[in-house]
């Protein structure tokens, strides 16, 4: 599975510039952390914006983590096994960022239960995901189901504000804020 993700990262330009403004603003607005986890952090583009004393960037792609090392030489880098428990102790982080990750995860219940486990009580979970809603339905009508929901696409899940809120609530998180900006759903929740 890691090979698949490494092949995807090979298609991403090495210097793709800064992250989109709405994501930068969202991450910069998160509370400072003692220990932060950028889960699915890829090349570390957003991890550079986290105010944390200690930063861990974890991803399934070794190629992405090599890029993250160049951006974040002081961060702990951890390669993950897909759909496996996270290799961190219970209640280890006070902030977990999952930026554009949930839509790619096979077992979202395992993933979020593991996030909850490694997050300390009252710790912060920050989630971003592409927004889907009525416009997605119109796009399906206009362009066709198969084209919109390509079975070879790395995207497995299509979330709306409401479905993300329900998912986080069902997994034991308290949603603190939920917004939609520039085609993204942005959520902050507490354990």
Predicted regions and their residues:
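S-adenosyl-L-methionine-dependent methyltransferase catalytic module, highlighting the catalytic core
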Residues: 4-7, 12, 106-114, 124-190
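A conserved beta-strand element that flanks and buttresses the S-adenosyl-L-methionine
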Residues: 97
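A short His-aromatic
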Residues: 100-104
